[in-house]
Amino acid sequence: MIVVYSKPACVQCVATTREMDKRGIPYEYIDLTKDQDAMATVRDLGYMQAPVVVAGDEHWAGFRPDKIMKLDTAMEPA
């Protein structure tokens, strides 16, 4: 399961979810302004900016089309 920790009115967050939607990548969206436990999780991972994307053992912050493309490629059937 891919999780996108996000905030409203965050340009990089919108770009991230838009790119994932365009590629048909399923994800769970968590609003950091409404979930203090999620905010603690993001901080524990070492991030101070949104979005934070967690995909299995991999995670990153910011809009990363290169990482999103790798997720898309990993989901393609062999």
Give each language-model segment a name.
Residues 1-25:
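Local sequence-structure signature of Cys/Sec-based thiol-disulfide redox active-site neighborhoods
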Residues 7, 47, 65:
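ATP/adenylate-binding site constellation spanning eukaryotic-like Ser/Thr protein kinases
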Residues 11-12, 36-37, 66:
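Short alpha-helical
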Residues 25-38, 47-49:
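Thiol-based oxidoreductase modules, predominantly thioredoxin-like and allied folds used
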Residues 50-61:
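A short, hydrophobic beta-strand/beta-hairpin element that forms part of a small beta-sheet core
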Residues 67-78:
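C-terminal basic regulatory modules in eukaryotic proteins
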